[in-house]
Amino acid sequence: YDGEEGVCYHFTYGNALFIMLNSESMRSAEGLAAAQAWVRDVIKSNPAKYVVVMEHYQWFFGESGRTSQYGRWKDLFDECGVDLAIGANNHIYARTNAIYQGRETDGSKGTVYIQTPSSDNERGQGLKEWTDNKDLIKFRWTEGGSTVGAILLRADDSKLHLTLYDRNGNALDSVSVAAKR
């Protein structure tokens, strides 16, 4: 969208629409509104079996569970049927099951929110007391300051499958996101 060409973008890969957002341009209310209008239009104009939205900042703060970008995007994701939201930034893996209207669902509607862990062995951080969103966040993981983790995303006709691996290739968590279209 205007001023964000090459920074905010989208593409279709197989049967999934991927939307990438510029977190820095969304700090102001005007920037957030422009980004949300663009996301709404991209989803409407690019029908796909799965919709995945990615941005740099976390949906929840992994160390405590406190809400971060989730509060700014959840209503739009509910409205547009976003299947998977991937964020990062605080380098602690955190995952929800499908959430719709602020509550966990059976997966037939709602968005799964995931924060990716650190992958460079330098930017991890430790967990703190889990104070918020215990009903929404289903799994958290970090190795502390030297975290290395990776997420494998596979897709088939009925589900997206995500698996978290540690530095030694051990599977630590997995979630499947049901196709809703």
Place the predicted regions along the sequence by residue.
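Short, solvent-exposed loop/turn segments at secondary-structure boundaries
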Residues: E30-G31, E63-T67
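Extended active-site neighborhood of metal-dependent phosphoesterases/phosphodiesterases
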Residues: Y1-P47, R72, L76-D78, L84, ...
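Short acidic, glycine-rich surface-loop motifs adjacent to enzyme active sites
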Residues: N46-E63
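Short beta-strand edge segments in extracellular beta-sheet folds
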Residues: A178-K180
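Residue-level signal for glycine
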Residues: G169-A171
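Hydrophobic residues embedded in beta-strands of well-ordered beta-sheets
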Residues: L17, K159-L162
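Active-site glycine-centered loops adjacent to acidic/histidine catalytic or metal-binding residues
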Residues: H56, A88-N89
